């Protein structure tokens, strides 16, 4: 009897695992990026990225309208290709990587906004401040993967005001404006692998 129960449990968890795997999409980090840009000295722009991040996407519909997204980003992985500036960004003037080690996003809606266009709304948390934001997302299509399954490509963008999240460092310049602008443009380029059914 115990052996029969064990077989039932193994079968149940095996089916459950397969079902979850078919719903879930695996992020290909080597072909994905989380980047940002911000005005510098009013007239130019500085860009950077986070090297350590994880994004979980699930959807069971072909039009993705039941899509759900959860993302976490390690603040300490920030890079702008300038060691001194990166160190400053990790301090309490900006992200305070020690006290607030992660940036998080959890979607609340995934709406179709045209052909291969979507509005992804959710809660973005930076420094324990949570605000609702809406990403403009473009679905770039899919292709069969050499080892089975499918590769899907997405691009999503959003702009936020850094002061809304306590990224408070501020220095004015003589010509007017700030050394670092208030608007941060965030761009995600994502490659997701959908396992074969």
Labelled PLM ranges:
Residues 21-197:
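Low-complexity, acidic/polar, glycine-enriched regions of mature
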């Amino acid at each position: 009897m115990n052996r029969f129960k064990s077989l039932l449990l193994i079968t149940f968890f095996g089916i459950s695992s397969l079902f979850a795997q078919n719903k879930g999409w695996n992020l290909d980090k080597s072909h994905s990026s989380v980047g940002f840009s911000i005005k510098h000295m009013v007239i130019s722009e500085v860009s950077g990225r986070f090297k350590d991040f994880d994004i979980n996407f699930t959807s069971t519909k072909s039009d993705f309208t039941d899509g759900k997204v959860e993302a976490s980003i390690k603040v300490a992985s920030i890079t702008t290709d300038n060691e001194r500036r990166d160190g400053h960004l990790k301090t309490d003037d900006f992200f305070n990587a020690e006290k607030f080690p992660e940036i998080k996003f959890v979607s609340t809606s995934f709406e179709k906004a045209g052909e291969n266009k979507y509005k992804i709304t959710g809660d973005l948390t930076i420094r324990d401040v949570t605000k609702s934001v809406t990403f403009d997302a473009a679905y770039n299509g899919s292709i069969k993967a050499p080892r089975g399954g499918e590769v899907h490509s997405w691009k999503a963008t959003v702009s936020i005001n850094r002061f809304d999240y306590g990224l408070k460092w501020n220095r004015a310049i003589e010509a007017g404006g700030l050394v670092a602008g208030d608007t941060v443009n965030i761009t995600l380029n994502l490659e997701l692998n959908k396992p074969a059914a």
